[in-house]
Amino acid sequence: MNKAIASKILITLGFLFLYRVLAYIPIPGVDLAAIKAFFDSNSNNALGLFNMFSGNAVSRLSIISLGIMPYITSSIIMELLSATFPNLAKMKKERDGMQKYMQIVRYLTILITLIQAVSVSVGLRSISGGANGAIMIDMQVFMIVSAFSMLTGTMLLMWIGEQITQRGVGNGISLIIFAGIVSGIPSAISGTFNLVNTGVINILMLIGIVLIVLATIFAIIYVELAERRIPISYARKVVMQNQNKRIMNYIPIKLNLSGVIPPIFASALLVFPSTILQQATSNKTLQAIADFLSPQGYAYNILMFLLIIFFAYFYSSIVFNSKDIADNLRRNGGYIPGLRPGEGTSSFLNAVASKLTLWGSLYLALISTVPWILVKAMGVPFYFGGTAVLIVVQVAIDTMKKIEAQIYMSKYKTLSAVGF
């Protein structure tokens, strides 16, 4: 490993460390003891799941309590609008247009953050504490302070994510979510053993949970490394021993084309609304809806299943453009044996991608929901979904591949420099 790659890894770790430091900076004017007591009693619902994705920042009411979710939500909205309006889709493909597009995403993130921050501030009044619940200062002042604090925190996370993507290794936003989930693993393990010691969970249940986790990890690794290789042939003629030879190659198409995006998008759409509804303890109708959409309920997991399939198809169509691949092949003198260059190749690649996306979307949906079904059947008293495991393993594999690619690239540059 050369110095450049080592430097990128250190930069990535440094920014992730900064992210974890921010998780311990609380919003001024709140009763942290009341907040902790509230989250201890609500760890099994949407609040607990939202807290997990934020790296326990919510339970501390940190300035990054909203995490990166507002940015993800704004990205979802913009992607859907891009698919609807051709001018917006065209803007994304241009260099200057992409900058404008990202600026719109940032402005939308600010708007969503402010709306969510005000919602959280109002919800804190229902938490048992002083006259204003967990709020220790004037309500109007607190709403301004909390909105500014959470907006600052979310903007800092956006900046950290962009810096990691540009100067480090891997996708910055995915790594932030990864770090948040991983940071909660020690406390989750400790909490599980406490349940064993108190007799809430027996040894057989513990063994069952471990086996489910290991099986989930194995399935994710197996599928994430699976790909369909489409052989291609180039018409370049290489004169060797008076014979014309063709250069053979292939197009690798992953079984899971959409990567980790569908479960992240689906979680973002389900978790925060459920969290806001959970705080409406005075309204029986909203509380009933919140209970209905609890992560431990069937409705949440059915919606999760369907949303993941939708986003898998939606995002796959964005990241895999069969027409562009077919055009690039034709320009470079390449073709798929037995198929005409251009439209024929594009139709074939599109058909292959559609079949793979079908199985890939089902894999993502099943991995995100089946572990919960198994754990619920065992009678385990806490929520365990495969979404967190899926995100952690996928991001780890993706980051390792990018590091490996950069190592190979540096070796190639070294060999080119010495004349090989």
Swiss-Prot record:
Kindly list the residue ranges recorded as spanning the membrane: 9-29, 61-81, 104-124, 141-161, 173-193, 203-223, 257-277, 300-320, 355-375, 377-397
Among the GO biological process terms of this entry, one is: intracellular protein transmembrane transport
Return the InterPro entries for the record: SecY, SecY/SEC61-alpha, SecY_CS, SecY_dom_sf
Please give the superkingdom of this protein's source: Bacteria
Keywords from UniProt, A to Z, are:
Cell inner membrane, Cell membrane, Membrane, Protein transport, Translocation, Transmembrane, Transmembrane helix, Transport
Family affiliation: Belongs to the SecY/SEC61-alpha family.
Entry protein name = Protein translocase subunit SecY
Query: What's the source species for this entry?
Result: Helicobacter pylori (strain J99 / ATCC 700824) (Campylobacter pylori J99)
Gene this protein is translated from: secY
